Amino acid sequence: MSLQFIGLQRRDVVALVNFLRHLTQKPDVDLEAHPKILKKCGEKRLHRRTVLFNELMLWLGYYRELRFHNPDLSSVLEEFEVRCVAVARRGYTYPFGDRGKARDHLAVLDRTEFDTDVRHDAEIVERALVSAVILAKMSVRETLVTAIGQTEPIAFVHLKDTEVQRIEENLEGVRRNMFCVKPLDLNLDRHANTALVNAVNKLVYTGRLIMNVRRSWEELERKCLARIQERCKLLVKELRMCLSFDSNYCRNILKHAVENGDSADTLLELLIEDFDIYVDSFPQSAHTFLGARSPSLEFDDDANLLSLGGGSAFSSVPKKHVPTQPLDGWSWIASPWKGHKPFRFEAHGSLAPAAEAHAARSAAVGYYDEEEKRRERQKRVDDEVVQREKQQLKAWEERQQNLQQRQQQPPPPARKPSASRRLFGSSADEDDDDDDDEKNIFTPIKKPGTSGKGAASGGGVSSIFSGLLSSGSQKPTSGPLNIPQQQQRHAAFSLVSPQVTKASPGRVRRDSAWDVRPLTETRGDLFSGDEDSDSSDGYPPNRQDPRFTDTLVDITDTETSAKPPVTTAYKFEQPTLTFGAGVNVPAGAGAAILTPTPVNPSTAPAPAPTPTFAGTQTPVNGNSPWAPTAPLPGDMNPANWPRERAWALKNPHLAYNPFRMPTTSTASQNTVSTTPRRPSTPRAAVTQTASRDAADEVWALRDQTAESPVEDSEEEDDDSSDTGSVVSLGHTTPSSDYNNDVISPPSQTPEQSTPSRIRKAKLSSPMTTTSTSQKPVLGKRVATPHASARAQTVTSTPVQGRLEKQVSGTPSTVPATLLQPQPASSKTTSSRNVTSGAGTSSASSARQPSASASVLSPTEDDVVSPATSPLSMLSSASPSPAKSAPPSPVKGRGSRVGVPSLKPTLGGKAVVGRPPSVPVSGSAPGRLSGSSRAASTTPTYPAVTTVYPPSSTAKSSVSNAPPVASPSILKPGASAALQSRRSTGTAAVGSPVKSTTGMKTVAFDLSSPQKSGTGPQPGSAGMGGAKTPSDAVQNILQKIEKIKNTEE
């Protein structure tokens, strides 16, 4: 429940709210001890009635905050009882001179008990302290107070003055802030005093602490109730003379009696609940007629305006209300203040009665002339303020009227992106506009299918560069404002400045110079029709918005809102390679050889294994490493979403999935969308290792780590570093040659039935890890649920020069030259062997971060076949089981297969394809395996390892989407060839010549048909029978043209 204030500036409201929020941290929690906070209620510039309301609201919130932090003294009271027993025990054994008097005070200490009523705590403590002090003074032969009606003062016995002063300062701090008790660093066990005196001093300190807290709390509570009741009475008197409905309504609310905390909370709830009903009864300013809500003045406001506004109030009040008699004889009989003398604000800021000020000023020569001049100047200023407010109100009404008219206009006809459209007048496809290019270089874009000078719609406003001419304080004067149909359904709009796209720094959106953006958006309104998100000019809208974006967003995100996307535009260039992430090595396959050209993922039986830093993999149980997966149910079948598929194909720039598919996993799966950095040139190449000993050690370590649970180590804080931290195998600083970092590349050898030797490769550059998840709770062992176990790997990136911090959410890249094969040598063994034992399990995973770098072995139920992977969702038909399409064997493990790539023109990356996931089993459901950390409390993010060839141009990347079913984005006719189990890729591509045209999402098959009995040859493109990368590019272009023709 938030507080409501009237007529205050935003900084004043923030100051009031922050004061209440941090009340317990103030040295003094008394509100009246902070006069600056009370002045922020508008004491100097608001109407008296409004100031009283703001103060009432502040006191109600202050009282509620005090009771929320009501100090609990239960533990201190128990300590006090224990100390009372200790003093009585020592008192019974002490030889007092007057045993009868001492016996009475000892009986008081024995009977000291606290009842359920906290209001009696201070009285009980005070009686016990008086008796204890008398016993201590009797033991040291000090004089007692014997006067009638006086009691012995509660004081410390036989302590130094400096120690007593420190104790008094500590107790005074407790009295001013009873919520924060600072401990006293003082030793009260003095050797010069007896045990009875030391026990009494400790009892006195504890008792005075309880008394200060209780009495200061009761004092603040009484003060709050008194101030609230006082301001309620004043507001009732102020509103009594107002005959409007809202004033009477507020006055009836204020008549509720406030006697305790519950009644105060009830009054606060009533005031906040009906705030909009009575808010107009409180003027916004002392002398302003046109405020934010234009409150109407009542007849009793004239006197208040004259009194609070000073001389300036006479100019703002109409002529008939200006008093005609001098101030000396001014009568206040009818004033609602009942005899209160008016005050006037002087130049120096002090307040003086109006009669005295008038007598002092009338003695000066020429006073009336100066007063008249001053009033005239003030009148002119006030008139300007009123006129300015009227103009602003009129302009606002005009804008609202124009917006309503534009909403009633029919939407412009949707246009498809045309690759032949041009931005500048220098192209040769439209010769009739060459004469205009000399006059204006910024030629308006013509609609497709039209020609001539009249093809541009909207005149000067429809030009894509018209926003540059009308930016600033100007606004378009002619031409319709092309508002998308999706935006016209909203009731509230706001005018924003022209949006400049990222394709061209000086280009403004073609549909309108001033864009109309809705203030409120609901998820149900985002995708309610097939024609909702069509751009009026074919360009992707340029805003970081789920509805308006020209980016590729991860459509498998199970969260409600997508992650911040990366703006992308694409064209064909050099190939890139990404290995599958989130999978473990199968039983019949070890680590494979990394090749400089990407391996065709569709020629392999199933997904590629995940490269880990030490080569440790968890095998799959049984003789069938490729476990089949059942087909998708009806609600998850992409063939049952024809409407959404058609919409996604028609609007490729809106790659956002609002249709959350039902999943059984409890942990959300997200893909880290990333932006590559320019990789440094590597100094060494990947070296293949054929060491049988290293493989044997890895398999031995696997057998031991599979049986041992994963524990949080003491290096949790060191491991869970930020996105720029560098992690090595032994958690040490990387050396200059970086020969100790070992990576295990993936392999695709399904024909082997026995565990093969794991081949290791070395990288010549350090690896950095990217972590975007939360840090798990330290000191706790977290059990990973069976259904949410997902494998993850560490994203690796070469460090160029200094170890720069990588942007969170961006993938890291590895130069492709690191993956060039070298002649295998028995001497090139791993310089850091993995030792056996459960304690060294973290070394095999290269000291991964706790949350995002954990490697969890999925169980059999979590296996995702290629038919259910997000890339296979491109097919419109229902995915077939994994058994129906047996994979073609790979003959050469070191073969090179070319894959077409996409070059980003705006710093983004293209989604080319992803090897499907590999089923992994071998551990019990819900049990951790491998050398991972249990961090299932945070969402897991499958890592992405992108390998780039050595080039100075911008690189594209291959993104691995998590195995979550998503709706198809192709029409049935366009994806008939993609219904098999072959891996497909999705790319948002533009024209090879111009990257500023509209982008389309196309699907192409990475597994091209090859001759029977022959596998992919090294160096071949492996796409559509192409032998060179250029042929592969031509094949993809032909498929894009076929899809366009199919749509038309």
UniProtKB/Swiss-Prot annotation:
The keyword Glycoprotein applies. Residues 474-489, 730-742, 765-775, 790-799, 807-834, 977-986, 1007-1017 have a biased composition (Polar residues). Glycans are attached at S921, S952. Pfam families: Herpes_UL32. Residues 428-438, 709-721 have a biased composition (Acidic residues). Residues 371-386, 508-524 have a biased composition (Basic and acidic residues). InterPro entries: Herpes_UL11/UL32. Residues 366-386, 398-548, 658-944, 973-1032 are annotated as: Disordered. Residues 451-461 have a biased composition (Gly residues). Phosphorylated by host CCNA2. The keyword Secreted does not apply. Residues 462-473, 671-687, 744-756, 835-854, 865-883, 911-927, 935-944 have a biased composition (Low complexity). It is found in: Virion tegument; Host cytoplasm; Host nucleus. GO terms for molecular function: structural molecule activity. GO terms for cellular component: host cell cytoplasmic vesicle; host cell nucleus; host cell perinuclear region of cytoplasm; host cell viral assembly compartment; viral tegument. Keywords: Glycoprotein, Host cytoplasm, Host nucleus, Host-virus interaction, Phosphoprotein, Virion, Virion tegument. Participates in the last steps of viral maturation and release. Associates with nuclear capsids prior to DNA encapsidation and later preserves the integrity of nucleocapsids through secondary envelopment at the assembly compartment. Interacts with host CCNA2 and thereby blocks the onset of lytic gene expression to promote establishment of a quiescent state of infection in undifferentiated cells. Belongs to the herpesviridae large structural phosphoprotein family. Interacts with host BICD1 and RAB6A. Interacts with small capsid protein UL48A; this interaction links together the capsid and pp150. Interacts with host CCNA2. This is Large structural phosphoprotein.
